[in-house]
C-alpha cells in the first residue's frame, strides 16, 4: 500500500478514514532499517552474523530468470551421451554444458563458502531487509532456511519474492526524494549462524515516538506457557529498549524483532523493521498502532531537541500526578489465545501464496522430461481428455468411480 503524502488530520463522522494515517515514509528511514546500517551499533546484542557487500554481477545473477546453480562437484554426462559420433575422449561433441554462473562473482562465491565454514557449516541468509522465508518450500531442509553450501543460499535467494522486493521495490510507497534512488542502496548478503530457534520465543515490538506501544509474538501458534511470563518478558524487552535502542536509533518510529530464549533474561536483537505498511503488524493492526492513545511524555514532546532531559528526581513541589499516569502505563503484550482462530491450522499455511503446487515441484525435480509430462497431462485435463481427481482419491481403487472436478 503506498504511503500517504499528508499527515493525519482530524476527521468527523461524515469524513471517514479512507487510508492509514501514516506520516510520509522517507527513503532515509528505509535505509536506516537496512541490516548493515544498524548492525555495528548493536552488534553485542545481535545474533552472530557476517555481512558480505554484493557486486553488480551478483545482483544481476539474482535478478536473472531461471535458477542455474554453480557446479559444486565434478559432473559427468550420462552413459547415453556416448555414441559412435563421439570424439576420441568418448564424449559427444554436441553435448551442451552450462557455464558456471559463479565465474562472474568468484570472490563473493569464495567469501560465502568461507563464511559458512567459519560459522560452523550452517547459516541462514538474508539481504538488507528480508530473509527468504517464503522460499523454504524449495529447500532440501524441509521448511527451513538452513544452508550448508553456497548453492543452498543461491537457491533460496533466487526463489524468494521477499528477496525480489528488496531488489526491485525497496523504496515503493516512499515520499519523493530525488537525492536518494535505488543506486544509493549498497546491497549486502547477511549470513547468520544457524541454530534451532524456538519460535515461541520470538517477539515483535512496535515503537512510536521512541516508546514501545505494543509487543506480540511472531509465531502465530498458541503457547500456554507464555502467559505467566508476560511480566518477565515485557520487563526484559523494555529494559533492553531503554538501554540500547531508545536514544540511539535514528528514527523515532520503527519496529524491532527480538529473541528471548530460556531463562528469558537475555534479549537478542534479530531485526529492525520500517514503520510502514510493508511490515506485518501481526496481532495488531496498523490502524490500532497509529491511533493508539498513549500518555504524553513527562516533559513535552518525545524526540524533541527543545525538551530538556528528565531530572533524576522530582522536585518537592511536584505533586507527581503526571508521573503516576506515566509510570502506570505499559505497552500491551499480545499472545495467541487458545480459542483464537490463528491457533488452529484451518487457515492457509504461512507464505502459501508464494509456494508452488507439490506436483509442479516434483515435476521440476525430475528434470525437463518431468515438466514436459506434467504440462502435457495438465493440457489433457483442461481439454477433458484426462480426468482430474479429488484430493485423497486413490486411482487404483476400482470399486469407486473417479469423479471429475467441475470448475
From Swiss-Prot:
Protein name: Translation initiation factor eIF2 assembly protein
Chain positions recorded as ATP binding sites: 126, 129, 131, 133, 192-195, 202, 204, 218, 257, 271, 273
Compositional bias annotation for Acidic residues: 90-100
Chief location of this protein within or outside the cell: cytoplasm
Chain segments carrying region Disordered: 73-101
Residues bound to Mg(2+): 271, 273
Reported function: ATP-dependent protein-folding chaperone for the eIF2 complex. Binds to the gamma subunit of the eIF2 complex which allows the subunit to assemble with the alpha and beta subunits.
Biological processes per GO annotation: eukaryotic translation initiation factor 2 complex assembly
Any one GO cellular component localisation term in the record: cytoplasm
GO molecular function, one term: protein folding chaperone
Keyword vocabulary terms for this entry: ATP-binding, Chaperone, Cytoplasm, Magnesium, Metal-binding, Nucleotide-binding
Taxonomic superkingdom: Eukaryota
Similarity-based family: Belongs to the CDC123 family.
Amino acid at each position: 500500500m503506498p504511503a500517504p503524502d499528508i499527515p493525519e488530520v482530524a476527521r468527523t463522522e461524515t469524513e471517514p478514514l479512507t487510508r492509514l494515517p501514516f506520516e510520509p515514509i522517507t527513503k532515509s528511514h528505509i535505509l536506516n532499517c537496512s541490516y548493515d546500517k544498524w548492525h555495528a551499533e548493536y552488534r553485542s546484542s545481535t545474533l552472530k552474523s557476517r555481512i558480505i557487500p554484493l557486486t553488480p554481477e551478483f545482483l544481476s545473477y539474482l535478478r536473472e530468470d531461471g535458477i542455474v546453480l554453480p557446479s559444486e562437484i565434478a559432473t559427468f554426462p550420462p552413459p547415453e551421451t556416448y555414441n559412435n559420433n563421439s570424439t576420441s575422449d568418448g564424449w559427444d561433441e554436441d553435448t551442451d554444458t552450462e557455464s558456471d554462473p559463479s565465474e562472474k562473482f568468484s570472490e563473493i562465491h569464495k567469501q560465502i563458502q568461507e563464511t559458512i565454514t567459519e560459522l560452523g557449516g550452517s547459516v541462514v541468509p538474508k539481504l538488507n531487509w528480508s530473509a527468504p522465508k517464503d522460499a523454504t518450500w524449495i529447500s532440501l531442509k524441509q521448511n527451513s532456511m538452513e544452508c550448508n553450501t553456497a548453492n543452498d543460499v543461491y537457491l533460496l535467494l533466487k526463489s524468494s519474492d521477499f528477496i525480489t522486493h528488496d531488489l526491485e521495490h525497496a523504496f515503493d510507497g516512499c515520499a519523493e526524494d530525488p537525492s536518494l534512488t535505488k543506486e544509493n542502496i549498497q546491497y549486502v548478503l547477511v549470513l547468520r549462524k544457524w541454530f534451532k530457534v524456538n519460535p515461541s520465543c520470538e517477539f515483535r515490538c512496535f515503537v512510536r515516538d521512541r516508546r514501545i506501544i505494543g509487543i506480540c509474538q511472531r509465531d502465530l501458534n498458541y503457547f500456554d506457557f507464555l502467559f505467566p511470563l508476560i511480566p518477565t518478558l515485557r520487563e526484559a524487552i523494555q529494559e533492553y529498549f531503554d538501554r540500547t535502542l531508545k536514544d540511539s536509533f535514528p528514527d523515532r518510529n520503527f519496529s524491532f524483532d527480538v529473541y528471548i530464549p530460556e531463562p528469558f533474561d537475555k534479549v537478542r536483537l534479530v531485526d529492525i523493521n520500517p514503520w510502514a505498511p510493508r511490515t506485518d503488524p501481526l496481532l495488531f493492526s496498523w490502524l490500532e498502532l497509529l491511533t493508539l492513545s498513549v500518555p504524553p511524555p513527562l516533559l513535552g514532546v518525545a524526540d524533541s531537541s527543545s525538551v530538556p532531559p528528565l531530572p533524576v528526581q522530582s522536585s518537592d513541589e511536584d505533586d507527581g500526578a503526571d508521573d503516576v499516569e506515566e509510570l502506570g502505563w505499559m505497552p500491551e503484550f499480545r499472545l495467541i489465545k487458545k480459542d483464537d482462530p490463528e491457533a488452529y491450522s484451518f487457515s492457509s499455511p504461512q507464505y502459501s501464496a508464494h509456494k508452488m503446487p507439490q506436483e509442479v515441484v516434483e515435476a521440476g525435480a525430475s528434470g525437463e522430461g518431468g515438466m514436459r509430462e506434467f504440462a502435457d497431462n495438465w493440457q489433457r485435463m483442461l481439454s477433458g481428455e484426462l480426468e482430474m481427481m479429488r484430493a485423497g482419491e486413490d486411482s487404483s481403487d476400482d470399486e469407486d468411480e473417479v469423479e471429475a472436478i467441475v470448475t
